[in-house]
């Protein structure tokens, strides 16, 4: 008969192994906000979930830029795809210009990356290497997007080549290549095992305020087989409980 300490050791081993990999997730914002999300900075900029989208707005001035972030804590042990779909209800793009930036960021142990789309329709990709390098790896490039459009951004990291393929699509259309290659100093490195974040930043004094809705956001590793530790813990403990009942 196995002793209780043996069960505890097995549970700890299973849980510990799960915490080594990057935390994956997929959220379509169809229900209450998952507790894993962190609502940060400008409280009034967080509009909450409505019609399957998480809304954000912003005011001009210090601290008036809301951020929605989520931990991805773990180790970069495989390729991954980080993707987000956003509806730009009111932003600019030739309409009433809100003089704002939409920022999509990911942070890791070796650096961070961010996509910045301004209200004129120019998008750029920035990479910072914690060893010292930092700058745009894709400069401001005008993309065809308008108020009311659904914009999907996808960052696919290849662990073997240490490169990324970054694409975007509008209203469910075919993906369009935006950038393919390495980082500011060559390799991309780990830019995704700390947290991911969306920020809306209003930099101008325009009377018009930005209004966006995050429709879908996911982070998947190759094979998409790494559940979060809480899920593994539940499965592990349930299995150990059944083993104990059989004794």
Please report, for each region that a protein language model flagged, where it lies by residue.
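Carbohydrate-binding surfaces in secreted/extracellular proteins
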Residues: 29, 84-86, 147-182
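C-terminal cell-surface anchoring/sorting signal
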Residues: 1-19, 230-247
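Flexible glycan-contacting loops in extracellular carbohydrate-active proteins
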Residues: 178-212
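Extracellular glycan-recognition surfaces and repeat-rich motifs
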Residues: 32-64
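Short, aromatic/His-centered strand-loop micro-motif at the edge of beta-sheets
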Residues: 128-152
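Extracellular beta-strand elements of beta-rich domains used
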Residues: 29, 215-219
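Secretory/extracellular carbohydrate-interaction modules
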Residues: 58-125
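Boundary/junction segments of secreted and surface-exposed precursor proteins
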Residues: 20-28
């Amino acid at each position: 008969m196995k002793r209780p300490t043996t069960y505890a050791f097995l549970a700890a081993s299973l849980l510990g192994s799960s915490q080594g990999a990057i935390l994956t997730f997929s959220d379509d914002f169809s229900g209450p906000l998952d507790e894993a999300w962190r609502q940060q900075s400008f409280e009034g900029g967080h509009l909450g979930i409505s019609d399957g989208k998480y809304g954000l707005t912003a005011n001009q001035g210090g601290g008036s830029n809301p951020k929605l972030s989520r931990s991805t804590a773990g180790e970069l042990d495989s390729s991954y795809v980080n993707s987000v779909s956003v509806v730009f209800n009111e932003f600019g793009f030739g309409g009433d210009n809100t003089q704002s930036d939409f920022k999509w960021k990911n942070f890791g142990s070796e650096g961070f990356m961010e996509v910045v789309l301004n209200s004129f329709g120019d998008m750029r990709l920035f990479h910072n290497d914690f060893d010292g390098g930092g700058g745009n790896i894709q400069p401001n490039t005008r993309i065809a997007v308008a108020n009311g459009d659904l914009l999907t951004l996808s960052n696919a990291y290849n662990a073997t080549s240490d490169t990324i393929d970054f694409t975007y699509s509008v209203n469910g259309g075919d993906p369009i290549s935006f950038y393919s290659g390495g980082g500011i100093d060559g390799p991309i490195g780990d830019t995704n095992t700390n947290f991911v974040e969306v920020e809306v930043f209003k930099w101008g004094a325009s009377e018009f305020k930005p209004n966006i809705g995050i429709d879908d956001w996911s982070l998947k590793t190759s094979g998409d087989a790494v559940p979060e530790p809480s899920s593994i813990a539940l499965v592990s403990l349930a299995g150990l409980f059944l083993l104990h009942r059989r004794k």
